[in-house]
């Protein structure tokens, strides 16, 4: 008799496309639980907008306390979501149940799940905290298109 696995696959990661109601590659202004903090310089994107969670929003993942949520946006769209939580082994078990077995990266000393559209890394953040980092590969693709257009504009301006 074959047993069915309760563990999901990375298809579930694609389906969720982000953290809670914050979805990657969507307009950042639609999330009332986020507020603008600042613009930062970025090696890849040149400039990114930083948004942080408002008080009373994104307080926990089940019983696990969330310390911080930071969202990076490129041209108003969500590129990356960073979630900092208290250290709790239940978080890793929950991620495995939701998205399947991760790959371990000894170089980054973290675990990751990856699809064609996004990646999720999980690891330590300081001694007593954990970090989830969702990154949109779709937004990286848009950046490449923007850079091609910029080069095209420059080449036509001679």
Which positions does each model-derived feature cover?
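Non-cytosolic coordination micro-motifs
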Residues: 8-51, 80-158
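Mid-chain, structured segments of secreted extracytoplasmic proteins
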Residues: 50-91
